[in-house]
Design a protein with these regions (language model features):
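Mature N-terminal, pre-catalytic/accessory segment of carbohydrate-active enzymes
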Residues: 110-152
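Interfaces that engage single-stranded nucleic acids at replication/repair/recombination sites
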Residues: 140, 159-160
Length: 160
């Protein structure tokens, strides 16, 4: 099933192929809205650094801070303000997918999963550190990464 609108370009298409795409996800029954940014290095011969700003991502809800999580490496990249640059170095023909989670009130936030590139639409519900996957995804389970956000500081929740 379709869970979101098609990806949109973040920046004007100037080079060989577009390199920055964004897909916003809203309307999830148990998660606040987020967006996924895809970075693509179409160059066949060289690595390339690609960057973007959260403020430029279409459909991303406004916030004072965003948690960034990279799907392939399953790494928390940090907390960024809307105007901060988020940069990744991509090998030739490589791509990266980054989930941006708006951070508002203090608490625990789901910032990433390892099961789906949407980083959340495979999740039916979240309670504390427990995420339940949708019936159509089973028998697979998702490894979820949570961020504890308090006093303007974020740290990955180490779990029990």
């Amino acid at each position: 099933p379709t869970y979101a609108t098609p990806a949109k370009l973040i920046y004007e298409w100037k080079d060989y192929l577009p390199e920055h795409f964004a897909t916003p996800f809203a309307g999830h029954e148990s998660l606040p809205p987020w967006a996924v940014v895809s970075l693509c290095n179409w160059n066949g011969g060289a690595a390339k650094k690609l960057s973007f700003k959260a403020a430029d991502v279409p459909g991303l809800p406004k916030a004072d801070a965003y948690a960034a999580f990279e799907v392939k490496t399953q790494k928390f990249l940090g907390v960024f303000k809307p105007g901060d640059s988020i940069e990744q170095e991509l090998a030739a023909h490589a791509a990266r997918v980054i989930r941006l989670t708006p951070l508002a009130e203090e608490g625990r936030y789901l910032i990433g999963t390892d099961l789906n590139l949407s980083c959340g639409m495979e999740i039916k519900s979240v309670s504390g550190r427990t995420a339940t996957v949708r019936d159509e995804v089973r028998p697979h389970e998702a490894k979820c990464t949570f961020l504890l956000w308090k006093g303007g500081e974020g740290a990955v929740d180490p779990g029990p």
